[in-house]
């Protein structure tokens, strides 16, 4: 096992920010103090589990990962947590093989998604939608 004691990694998605604290342990993963096994909704839990499944039990069962997530919606938070976990595992193992496996599965696990919401403009309800024009 690496000589590192604690590793802090962050992940972002839209407006959600996740900070993961990784330390040697026995495979406990908590998101905002909630164990991953009972984290709701189910879709978000599956999203967070993706890097763990890709990495394999032998890597993450030796670590305790505590994640604090804030901002955004539940899916944005899940993807931010997923990115934080993936980057933490990469930093902990220093494995290029694991990195290529993550990128082949889904690039946004390792590299951030730059897309953001376009600001609203006047003359309509959204960024591009315009108010309906009336001829009478």
Task: Locate predicted features.
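Structured, basic alpha/beta domains of bacterial-type, RNA-associated proteins
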Residues: 2-12, 18-70, 79-136
């Amino acid at each position: 096992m690496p000589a590192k004691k604690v590793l802090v990694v962050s992940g972002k998605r839209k407006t959600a920010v996740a900070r993961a604290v990784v330390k040697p342990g026995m495979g406990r993963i908590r998101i905002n103090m909630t164990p991953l096994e009972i984290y709701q909704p189910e879709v978000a839990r599956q999203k967070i589990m993706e890097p763990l499944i890709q990495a394999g039990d032998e890597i993450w069962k030796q670590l305790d990962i505590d994640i604090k997530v804030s901002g955004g919606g539940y899916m944005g938070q899940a993807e931010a947590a997923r990115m934080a976990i993936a980057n933490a595992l990469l930093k902990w193992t220093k494995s290029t093989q694991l990195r290529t496996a993550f990128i082949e599965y889904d690039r946004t696990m390792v590299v951030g998604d730059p897309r953001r919401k376009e600001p609203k403009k006047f003359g309509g309800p959204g960024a591009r939608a315009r108010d309906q024009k009336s001829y009478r």
